[in-house]
Each structure stands twice: as structure tokens, then as C-alpha cells.
């Protein structure tokens, strides 16, 4: 799955 974290998806 795609999760946006620390500016990265």
C-alpha cells in the first residue's frame, strides 16, 4: 500500500 510519510509516498 502507499502511505505518505516524511514527504515520501
Swiss-Prot record:
Superkingdom, taxonomy of origin: Eukaryota
Keyword Disulfide bond in record: yes
Cross-link (Cyclopeptide (Arg-Cys) (interchain with C-9 in subunit A)): 1
Cross-link (Cyclopeptide (Cys-Arg) (interchain with R-1 in subunit A)): 9
Disulfide bond sites: 4-9
Record key words, sorted: Antibiotic, Antimicrobial, Defensin, Disulfide bond, Fungicide
PTM per Swiss-Prot/TrEMBL: Forms a cyclic peptide with subunit A (PhTD-1). An additional intersubunit disulfide bond is formed.
GO terms, biological process: defense response to bacterium; defense response to fungus; killing of cells of another organism
Keyword presence, Disulfide bond: yes
Self-association and partners: PhTD-1 is a cyclic heterodimer composed of subunits A and B; disulfide-linked.
Membership in a protein family: Belongs to the alpha-defensin family. Theta subfamily.
Purpose of the protein: PhTD-1 has antimicrobial activity. In low salt conditions PhTD-1 has antibacterial activity against the Gram-negative bacterium E.coli ML35p (MIC=1.5 uM), the Gram-positive bacteria L.monocytogenes EGD (MIC=1.6 uM) and methicillin-resistant S.aureus ATCC 33591 (MIC=2.5 uM), and the fungus C.albicans 820 (MIC=1.6 uM). At high physiological salt concentrations the antimicrobial activity of PhTD-1 decreases slightly: E.coli ML35p (MIC=2.0 uM), L.monocytogenes EGD (MIC=1.7 uM), S.aureus ATCC 33591 (MIC=3.6 uM), and C.albicans 820 (MIC=6.5 uM).
Protein name: Theta defensin subunit B
Biological classification of the source: Eukaryota, Metazoa, Chordata, Craniata, Vertebrata
Amino acid at each position: 500500500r502507499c502511505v505518505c510519510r516524511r514527504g515520501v509516498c
